[in-house]
Amino acid sequence: MSNDIRSLGKSGKKFTNWATTYSCTPELYFEPETEDEIRKILAYAQEKDKKVKVVGFGHSPSDIACTTDFMISLCRYNNVIKVDKEKLQVTVQGGCLLKELNDHVLPANDMALSVQGAVCDLTAAGVISTGTHGTGAQFGIISSYVVNLELMKASGEVITINEEVNSELLPAAALSLGSLGVIISVTLQCEKAFRLHCKQVTNTLQNVIENLDVYVTSSDHFKFFWYPHTESVVCFNTNRTKEEPKVKSSWIWDMGVGYYLLQILLWFSTFFPSLVPSINRLYFKLFCSSSVERIDRSDKIFNFNCLFKQYVMEWSIPRNKVGVVLWELKEWIEKNRFPAHFPVEVRFVKGDNIYLSPCYDQDSCYINIIMYRPFNTLVSHETYWNEYQSIVAKHGGRPHWAKDHNFTGTEFIKLYPKWNEFCAIREKMDPNGMFLNANLERVFNSRPSPSRNHV
């Protein structure tokens, strides 16, 4: 069997994440198509005393997917298993892309996911394993919509987890960082298909912060972008609607100016950083100075173009800490004249009871900072990242699991009331740590091993 399984793997395969900020070369790279193949790969890994890392589409802008041992991509394990139109639930294999659900499966059955993030090129397993979220005060992270999981343990045993079977595992398995096993299938609770009406309006940072609760609760899915080096904010007030679609687009404007020209200007700013404040002001004036309305299918409003390669860092904080964090960040940027790119994205998520959820037991706000990498150029960002982390850490910040952070179990045990409970479940499910890589070894305070290259 060993030779048969080894022949399924590729050696010398380099894995690079979408942002091209992390890469690794696993000893063997697998793309299994069946549950039995996954089981045999795990058995072979045990035989050879190898770690196993399961990866999706590679959108995580950190080293969470990297390993030098065995890597399993679920890109071929991606079928839709069942659509239950009565319960409004969809069951898929772990590698099924949200894009497939959005474009084909859910519209064909008059269904939709209740909330989504910015990107749809994500696997179902990856979305729930890293705590992917959208925005909306009454909407949780996508993991909170999990109603059933089938999980393959390191032993090859597949267990079912839901509110009736192994229910004690559900708060851990719904967001596990891939540390409990391989997600064979996941069932997500959906709702009837719906359209969204997004009204984009300008505002000031001070006004939004002073009236934050009003803004957050007056829309189904409220978020705002702050443009550093300005007082300017663009608010996105998004609500469900039965109105007909209303979409206006221009390739020249959206791509020519909004993508290609911006990339050129930001590339010049790598030589002349003092240009960044002017670029931020220019693009706010070009794209945000007037009100814009869009009505479209829900996923087309939730998802948006993330433009070109980038560094990002995102933290979740208690909702009542938004003002103090943003004012401290703004003050630091201005005092140090750091050329911070736009936007600082601010979103809002309902609290939940998932052990490793950044929203555990609190309604939360996610604040995402960004530094673009025009034409894949290396851009200085470390001091910005370190300062932002120090600011949010003072105010109970919890990092987005898919993104860069320097925290370890020492910090997490103080931030997550159910940290010890999760660790006990992980050690029982995977006693030999097969599913740990360097990223997770840092998180759980095990001995780290090199697994990635960083740029």
Annotate each predicted stretch with a short phrase.
Residues 1-455:
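Noncatalytic alpha-helical scaffold of FAD-dependent oxidoreductases
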